[in-house]
């Protein structure tokens, strides 16, 4: 069976040609999949019945199945656990900002990076996600936003699966009735008001460890015939695979690249992040400077603040010496993980660390903590379900 959800328009043309179909069908099908968010070939009403049946027999649409949806009572952040066709589980997060909806997605099932403070890599890497599975997370959440099924969160406890069941019933009902999900017309006021406009590839997995599929995903995500999300509204986070950072720089894309730094020195970073055993901290930072100079896009450094580990005055001074003046660092109070002993510093201590960096000429922000009353840390929701 062909994974039709992972094919860009050019690949769709080739595939349809092998079925004896005209090239113009590719754009029609692509729009159904990634703009109208169809979940079944039978919903593609401007295709002949014969072609719909042929596609049903030859190909499949990646539709992640919601296993659990948690919704924060504090800020409305929604955390999704999806089951993929091979029964793998992945997490995604939907966040509401003043500018609109933003989604954080996973790029792999598990992770091989093994960062000491992260729940995602505790079970190692199972596999990379296909472009369709990465897009599928966004599209499943977009269907949810458009269908407004998550009102049930107001009536149930945070760990309920009722939201997921209601969403599953909605998509199943659409398939049974051969109707597409209730997606507003593109450019309509309702569509523009509720569309996901920003994407962060910062969930489970190392995106640059799934490099080829990541590039296809970016191409499809930004296609005007699909979700049409601007490259400038896409952030990709990496632990620091230096050759891939440089290779990505040569593509001269307009995406934002973020480096998970988390330590001010090679010695400390090696203890927290095994990737530092392969790529020295100065190499990783140098690659980010190369990316910024080559693309003209400002890069970001992520720094999980861990009480007593990397939050001292000396750490702030060493960090400012490592980075260039005017660099931007995003301070993230570490999320508690039950299998780890790491804890976040107090809010006051985090602000003090931020001010010290700014005194040294580093632009520092403290990430807004969202979804703290649900399984907010990356990988936690998946692990909780696997342990059942």
Stretch-by-stretch model annotation:
Residues 88-92, 98-106, 113-254, 265-267:
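Conserved Radical SAM active-site core
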Residues 53-56, 105, 279:
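Generic detector of bulky aromatic hydrophobic side chains
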Residues 143-148, 191-360, 364:
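Conserved AdoMet/S-adenosylmethionine-binding subsite of the radical SAM
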């Amino acid at each position: 069976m062909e994974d039709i959800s992972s094919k860009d328009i050019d690949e769709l043309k080739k595939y349809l040609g092998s079925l004896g179909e005209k090239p113009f069908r590719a754009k029609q099908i692509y729009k159904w999949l990634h703009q109208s968010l169809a979940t079944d070939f039978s919903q593609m009403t401007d295709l002949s019945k014969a072609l719909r049946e042929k596609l049903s027999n030859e190909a499949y649409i990646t539709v992640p199945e919601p296993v659990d949806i948690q919704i924060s009572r504090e800020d409305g952040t929604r955390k999704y656990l999806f089951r993929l066709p091979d029964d793998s589980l992945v997490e995604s997060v939907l966040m509401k900002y003043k500018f609109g909806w933003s989604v954080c997605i996973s790029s792999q099932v598990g992770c091989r990076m093994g960062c000491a403070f992260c729940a995602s890599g505790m079970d190692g890497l199972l596999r990379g996600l296909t472009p369709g599975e990465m897009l599928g997370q966004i599209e499943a959440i977009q269907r949810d936003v458009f269908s407004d099924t998550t009102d049930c969160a107001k009536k149930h406890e945070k760990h309920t699966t009722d939201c997921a069941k209601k969403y599953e019933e909605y998509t199943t009902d659409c398939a049974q009735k051969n109707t597409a999900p209730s997606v507003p017309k593109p450019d309509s006021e309702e569509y523009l008001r509720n569309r996901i406009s920003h994407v962060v590839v910062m969930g489970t997995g190392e995106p640059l460890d799934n490099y080829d599929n990541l590039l296809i995903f970016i191409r499809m995500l930004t296609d005007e015939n699909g979700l049409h999300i601007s490259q400038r509204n896409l952030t990709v986070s990496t632990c620091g695979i230096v050759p891939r950072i440089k290779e990505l720089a040569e593509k001269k894309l307009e995406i934002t690249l973020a480096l998970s730094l988390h330590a001010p020195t090679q010695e400390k970073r090696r203890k927290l992040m095994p990737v530092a055993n392969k790529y020295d901290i100065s190499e990783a930072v140098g690659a980010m400077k190369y990316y910024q100079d080559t693309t003209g896009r400002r890069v970001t450094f992520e720094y999980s603040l861990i009480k007593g580990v990397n939050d001292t005055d000396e750490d702030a001074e060493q960090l400012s010496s490592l980075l260039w003046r005017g660099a931007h660092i995003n301070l993230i109070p570490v999320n508690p993980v039950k299998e780890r002993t790491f804890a976040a510093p107090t809010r006051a201590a985090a602000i003090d660390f931020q001010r010290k960096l700014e005194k040294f000429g580093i632009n520092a922000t403290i990430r807004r903590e969202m979804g703290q009353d649900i399984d907010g840390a990356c990988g936690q929701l998946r692990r909780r379900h696997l342990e059942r």
